[in-house]
């Protein structure tokens, strides 16, 4: 029985992970759950899965959780604060750690788990976007194992030879006969919206993804295709890919989750229903397979598969992310921080949809920073970028 800690249990990835565990009660057991402030949902999860530990981001939320679990049979130990999160992420008993805390807040607990040589199921994008090289250096140093959870990176991983799977972040694609990684994306809900109407798009419209069920922040990122841009940055670190070894393709049906192009002309793809439980189950059971609970793909229900070149006028955030990846880790860290702040402002109706790309570019072009040499450097760059973004938004509002 594998013991699993879930960082970000009340979010979309966390709940999907618990669904996979529910489908495989003889294979996986929940050791610890970590969440932000959603005490109500955490209480439901604690009652259902009886973890040994539950950690909330602050004392108030932990107090609410204690009240909700009072007079129940749940014996979960309740903790709070960032130190507790880092401590729980590094528990000796854990066989696997699902890293699904959104944002740069997930970086330190993920590194704490790596330093204990854990098997990391990585859904937290920021770990690579802000510290990709530092991240994989730590993985190698401490003998940890990382498996990607994003559907695209997981699809690529499944399509790669074991020589690369066993040496993520360092192996040469060319040496294994690979010419390029083909990263697919749906194009989001505004794929066919006239360009002159984009500035009027609302948060609810941006969050209405045609294929995937996701949280609101990542749904907005999908609408701008910043999500694909961040995945592009991640993929370069995950698979040690150069700019010339990366391709981005819009695939509206989200059936082909990504592909790998080989020297001999072969293209290997991973396909299936757009359900995050598939990559989660794959990574949890690797190198074996287990039940995910996802519906099997019915080829006879598929009308057509489309492939479209990205339009960078429609998706300026995608273009900006690719540019940032060429500049280096400082630039991608700035972009990630700026985007988190400006998307939050959009969701709170402080800026327009089209302001997201404009503000992101202003912030990225404002900074000319040296490359980070430590996690503290990364966090300092992140802090500076957030402050600059907030100042620009304040001028607009």
Curated annotation (Swiss-Prot):
Annotated organism of origin: Proteus mirabilis (strain HI4320)
Chain residues that bind NADPH: 10-13, 36-38, 124, 126, 215
Disulfide-linked positions: none
Keyword Glycosyltransferase found: no
Protein name: 1-deoxy-D-xylulose 5-phosphate reductoisomerase
Family: Belongs to the DXR family.
E.C. number(s) listed in UniProt: 1.1.1.267
Residues binding 1-deoxy-D-xylulose 5-phosphate, per UniProt: 125, 151-152, 186, 209, 222, 227-228, 231
The protein's required cofactors: Mg(2+); Mn(2+)
Class in the EC hierarchy, top level: oxidoreductase
Matching SUPFAM superfamilies: 1-deoxy-D-xylulose-5-phosphate reductoisomerase, C-terminal domain (SSF69055), Glyceraldehyde-3-phosphate dehydrogenase-like, C-terminal domain (SSF55347), NAD(P)-binding Rossmann-fold domains (SSF51735)
Subunit record text: Homodimer.
Pathway where it operates: Isoprenoid biosynthesis; isopentenyl diphosphate biosynthesis via DXP pathway; isopentenyl diphosphate from 1-deoxy-D-xylulose 5-phosphate: step 1/6
């Amino acid at each position: 029985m594998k013991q699993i800690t879930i960082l970000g249990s009340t979010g979309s990835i966390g709940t999907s992970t618990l669904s996979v565990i529910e489908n495989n009660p003889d294979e996986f057991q929940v050791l610890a759950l970590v969440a932000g402030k959603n005490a109500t949902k955490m209480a439901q999860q604690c009652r259902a899965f009886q973890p040994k530990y539950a950690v909330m981001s602050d004392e108030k939320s932990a107090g609410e959780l204690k009240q909700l679990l009072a007079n129940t049979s749940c014996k979960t130990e309740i903790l709070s604060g960032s130190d507790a999160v880092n401590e729980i992420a590094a528990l000796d008993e854990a066989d696997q750690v699902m890293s699904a805390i959104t944002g740069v807040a997930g970086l330190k607990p993920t590194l704490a788990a790596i330093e204990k040589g854990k098997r990391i199921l990585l859904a937290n994008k920021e770990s690579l976007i802000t510290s990709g090289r530092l991240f994989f250096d730590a993985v190698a140093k401490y003998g940890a194992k990382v498996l990607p959870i994003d559907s695209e990176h997981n699809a690529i991983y499944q399509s790669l030879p074991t020589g690369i799977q066993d040496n993520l972040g360092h192996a040469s694609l060319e040496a294994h006969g690979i010419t390029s990684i083909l990263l697919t994306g749906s194009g989001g809900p505004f794929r066919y919206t006239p360009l002159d109407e984009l500035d009027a798009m609302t948060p609810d419209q941006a969050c209405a993804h045609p294929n995937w069920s996701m949280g609101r922040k990542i749904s907005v990122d999908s609408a701008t295709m910043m999500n694909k841009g961040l995945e592009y940055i991640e993929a370069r670190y995950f698979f040690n890919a150069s700019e010339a070894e990366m391709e981005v393709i819009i695939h509206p049906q989200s059936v082909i989750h990504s592909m790998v192009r080989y020297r001999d002309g072969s293209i290997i793809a991973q396909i299936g229903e757009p359900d995050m439980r598939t990559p989660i189950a794959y990574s949890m059971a690797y190198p074996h397979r287990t039940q995910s609970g996802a519906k099997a793909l019915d080829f006879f229900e598929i009308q057509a598969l489309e492939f479209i070149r990205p339009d960078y006028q429609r998706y300026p955030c995608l273009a900006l992310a690719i540019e940032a990846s060429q500049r280096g880790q400082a630039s991608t860290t700035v972009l990630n921080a700026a985007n988190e702040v400006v998307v939050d402002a959009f969701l709170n109706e402080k800026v327009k949809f089209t302001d997201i790309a404009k503000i992101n570019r202003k912030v990225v072009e404002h900074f000319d920073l040296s490359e980070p040499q430590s996690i503290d450097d990364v966090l300092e760059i992140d802090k500076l970028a957030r402050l600059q973004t907030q100042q620009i938004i304040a001028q607009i509002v």
